[in-house]
């Protein structure tokens, strides 16, 4: 006869982890807000901000001024990546994600209440406040993506980082679709005068609901296993930005240029195409000629494209796990280079050609954007990962995104067609192709064990 004896020693507690569902929602909600805010601004910058905040300029100058204000956020983003990266690598991912969400959320709501420059006393103040809000948005955005990417990938099971990394990336198509649906609903229920007077403010004010939901979810998170290991190993960097530039500056340069084509494609597809699509075929205000689509019709076409964006973002994760980040992205980047040369024939192909351009462009966007949430963090050890991934991502935003709408309008006006805009995209893709060619594969790095720079 045997007697089982139960030890009185306490069992080792199972480490607490974030559930897959919580990781999905918490990483997705912030980037959804980020891109919702971006597209709300980009749409307003194309459609109403030139007249509201720069009323004394001609059509082209007002549009360029509107996009210049748009670009201020991208200048602020690297500063935000350093600021929030510092706390993300020293205090933790969770706390920093809450702070970045609050920063960009408050700035977005304030944009929704700025008086137009035509109001007495606001001729100079209104555009200045707009620029200040865009700067604050940029600071918050600079810390948002890196934290969301780490939340997903540092909680991912081994061999599934690229798949889990698509969670925050899905925020881009979701945010765009939400913003477009809001603008369509407003445009269909308001007159042009009502939309210009107050309707454009609704998307900015409505974002407060998303911010509240995001804060509620993120406050329930626990810290990621990777950062916990850094703390336990006493490997927390004193000054993460100094440490990452001292030990990993080549990886920052590599990551920046790897992201270049993604950002260029992204902002040409979402900002330039809308502006070109709805511009009059025979403008009388000095603006370059466009396709003359009704605003609502073109927004629906963009929504169709964004659906493909979301689907192929999801598809990119398994592909990047199977074939590797580098190999997959080399093929996709080559496709982007060819796509840039198709701008003119597709834009000239009527509605079918334009819709095909949007579907193809957004498909490539999903395939190139999806793996980035795994690839960029994989370049850096855990104790400087938040700072390193964020800095590379946001430096690329200046080179590939901040100037893209501005340069695109200038090239469009110079050539009186989108031909040079397409060449511009092809050049950015060529630069990214070289950066990828020089970068080693990151799929098999010791992601959880690589703690110290």
Outline where the language-model segments fall.
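Extracytoplasmic gate region of multi-pass secondary transporters
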Residues: 42-43, 249-309, 400-404
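Extracellular/periplasmic helix-loop-helix junction of adjacent transmembrane segments
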Residues: 45-77
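Helix-to-loop junctions at the C-terminal end of transmembrane segments
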Residues: 81-93, 312-325
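C-terminal ends and interior cores of transmembrane alpha-helices
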Residues: 102-122, 334-349
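Glycine-rich segments within core transmembrane alpha-helices of 12-TM secondary carriers
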Residues: 163-187, 393-404
């Amino acid at each position: 006869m045997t007697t089982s004896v139960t030890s009185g020693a306490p069992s080792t507690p199972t480490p607490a982890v974030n559930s897959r569902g919580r990781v999905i929602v918490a990483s997705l909600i912030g980037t959804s807000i980020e891109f919702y805010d971006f597209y709300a601004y980009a749409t307003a910058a194309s459609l109403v901000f030139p007249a509201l905040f720069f009323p004394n300029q001609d059509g082209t100058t007002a549009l360029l001024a509107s996009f210049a204000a748009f670009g201020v956020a991208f200048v602020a983003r690297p500063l935000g990546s350093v600021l929030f990266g510092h706390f993300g690598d020293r205090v933790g991912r969770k706390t920093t994600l809450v702070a970045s969400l609050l920063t960009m959320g408050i700035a977005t709501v304030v944009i929704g209440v700025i008086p137009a420059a035509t109001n007495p006393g606001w001729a100079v103040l209104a555009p200045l406040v707009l620029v200040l809000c865009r700067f604050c948005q940029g600071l918050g955005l600079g810390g948002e993506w890196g934290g969301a990417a780490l939340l997903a990938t540092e909680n991912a099971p081994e061999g599934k980082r690229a798949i889990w990394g698509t969670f925050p990336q899905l925020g881009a198509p979701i945010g765009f679709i939400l913003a477009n649906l809001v603008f369509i609903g407003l445009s269909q229920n308001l007159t042009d005068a009502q939309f210009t007077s107050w309707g454009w403010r609704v998307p900015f004010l409505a974002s407060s609901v998303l911010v509240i939901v995001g804060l509620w979810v993120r406050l329930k998170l626990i810290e990621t296993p990777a950062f916990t290991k850094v703390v336990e190993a006493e490997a927390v960097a004193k000054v993460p930005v100094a440490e990452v530039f001292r030990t990993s500056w080549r990886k920052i340069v590599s990551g920046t240029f790897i992201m270049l084509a993604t950002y260029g494609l992204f902002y040409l597809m979402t900002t330039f195409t809308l502006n070109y699509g709805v511009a009059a075929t025979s403008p009388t205000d000095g603006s370059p000629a466009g396709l003359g689509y009704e605003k609502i019709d073109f927004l629906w076409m963009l929504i169709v494209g964004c659906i493909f964006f979301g689907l192929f973002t999801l598809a990119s994760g398994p592909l990047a796990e199977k074939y590797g980040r580098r190999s997959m992205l080399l093929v996709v980047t080559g496709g982007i280079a060819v796509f840039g040369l198709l701008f003119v024939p597709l834009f000239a192909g009527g509605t079918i050609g334009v819709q095909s351009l949007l579907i193809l462009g957004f498909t490539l966007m999903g395939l190139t954007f999806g793996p980035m949430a795994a690839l960029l963090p994989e370049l850096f050890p855990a104790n400087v990962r938040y700072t390193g991934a964020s800095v590379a991502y946001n430096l690329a935003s200046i080179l590939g995104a901040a100037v893209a709408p501005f340069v695109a309008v200038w090239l469009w006006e110079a050539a009186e067609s989108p031909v040079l805009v397409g060449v511009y995209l092809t050049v950015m893709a060529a630069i990214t192709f070289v950066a990828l060619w020089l970068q080693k594969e990151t799929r098999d790095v010791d992601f959880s064990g690589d703690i110290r720079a």
